Amino acid sequence: MSVDELNQSILQYKEQLEQIAQALQLTRDETERSELNKLKSDLIELLELTVESLAATSDDDDAPDTAGRAPPATADNPIDDEFALFMREIKELQTEDSAAGEQAGEQTATEPERQPNDDDADNDDDADDKLDLDGLVGSKCSAPHLHTWGSTAYHNAMVCSLDADDLAHATAKVLFTNPTHREMLPCAYFLEGECRFTDEKCRYSHGEVVRLDQLRDYRAPQFERLRRAGSRALVKQSTRLWCKGTVTEVDFDAKRCKVRLEEGKREQLEVPFEDLLPLDEDEDGQEAAEDSESDTDGADEEEADDEALRKALLVEKSLFHPAPDRRLGEWEEHTRGIGSKIMQKMGYIVGTGLGREGEGIVVPVSAQVLPQGRSLDYCMELREQSNGDKDLFSVEKKLVQLKRQEAKRAAKDYERQRARESKSKDVFSFINEQVFSGAAGGESSRPNRNRPGALSRQELKEHSCKNLNIASLKLSEEIRRTEADVERLKIALTRHRAGTPAADNLLRQIDAKRAEISRMQASEGNISREQQLRSDKKKLTIF
């Protein structure tokens, strides 16, 4: 390096040393002071090396033929003068550094005694910070708002007050200039200082408190975006709320445009630019994405664990309650309802109570059916007489009572029917008992063989003509069937030799069938005679 470059480097190092010395006088933090002292020592060492390099370069340029011996220091040598000046300044800086260190040590030792009173430098810094923060009051910004459904969105707002007691957690109270929902709408009485309600009880906004680091730059309306067809904007309504709409026509000369609202009656309005805030879909989408990313960073894993823990606690809580006699939504088995299925999709666990924590009801609310045409006083008297029974007018209780009444009525009808059947015997049961009792041809048929007829005339008089006709038809069919059996037995008899046990058995069966046929023919004759007598009697009665 040349002599000029070395001189320039030395001057630069001196300026840096002066800056470090000033910083050491203003800094009280031990960590910062140690770093500054280390930087200062490095600069001093670098400066000494630079000065030595400068001296060596000057010696090389001015050296005589003598081997390596520098010329004696004279007052006319500028390098020696500069080196002497540098060493004197280095000593002064070291002296100032030691003095500043002693002063800082004394201040640290006496700090507990002087704790109520701050230093003048601290007072100046705090005053400067307060002056800077006070300048934010009345300024426009973009502040976040947490909606009732859980999402956060940024809206234009104005800072109305600050709380800067703790700068690390400073907050600001803002009023939204383009409120889109009722909870964002500034209270007119609060702005005039006449609102009688507190911030919590008033239906309108007295200012929303947000952290100072959450504020963003104010988004000024850019009406050039309205040139695009179908651009969206916020429109001020008579209710002071701003609703979304689509711009259909723009007049930049008159500064008016026509907007079709997206909600309500979807009517088309003509509004001035003062009541319009153009929206940028790209910015809105970007803000929404930033909000969603900031909200979901590191929350996905915790969300799954919290959901599993919540379900386990709900199931554990449900085990301490007695099991209900019926489950919620059991009536959907007989209908097309899907309410319980939707609830399960939304996270409901069968058997637990309603609500997020399972603190709600487990069984469905029972419907109450009051007596028709009665007053409520009468119904209350009935409930008092029943000792405050809550299920007195319950639909389920009435249904159980109706089922019991139906069961008792059915049992009585059955007993009455059986008694009626036991008293009145029809012709079919009589035929089955008297005529067909000896169909097997055994010993049970022997007492009937001695009787001349199975059905007497006196017994037939108790039955109607219709029953007699049916009985006669059945007897005819039974006679034909029995005769067919006799013919089949005769054919079987031809295949056996006479005198064998099989032939004797077949002969006994043929005799029994023939006796049965004779009895049925006798009964059929009695029925025919009874029918003929009734027919003749009817003709004589008509004559």
From Swiss-Prot:
InterPro entries: G_patch_dom, Znf_CCCH. CDD domains: Tudor_ZGPAT (cd20384). SMART domains: G_patch. GO terms for biological process: negative regulation of transcription by RNA polymerase II. It is found in: Nucleus. Residues 118-131, 277-304 have a biased composition (Acidic residues). GO terms for molecular function: DNA-binding transcription repressor activity, RNA polymerase II-specific; RNA polymerase II cis-regulatory region sequence-specific DNA binding; zinc ion binding. Gene3D superfamilies: 2.30.30.1190. Disulfide bonds: none annotated. It comes from the Eukaryota. Pfam families: G-patch (PF01585). A zinc finger (C3H1-type) spans 186-209. Residues 65-76 have a biased composition (Low complexity). Residues 55-79, 95-132, 272-304, 438-460 are annotated as: Disordered. GO terms for cellular component: nucleus. Keywords: DNA-binding, Metal-binding, Nucleus, Repressor, Transcription, Transcription regulation, Zinc, Zinc-finger. Residues 335-381 form the G-patch domain. Transcription repressor. This is Zinc finger CCCH-type with G patch domain-containing protein. It comes from Anopheles gambiae.
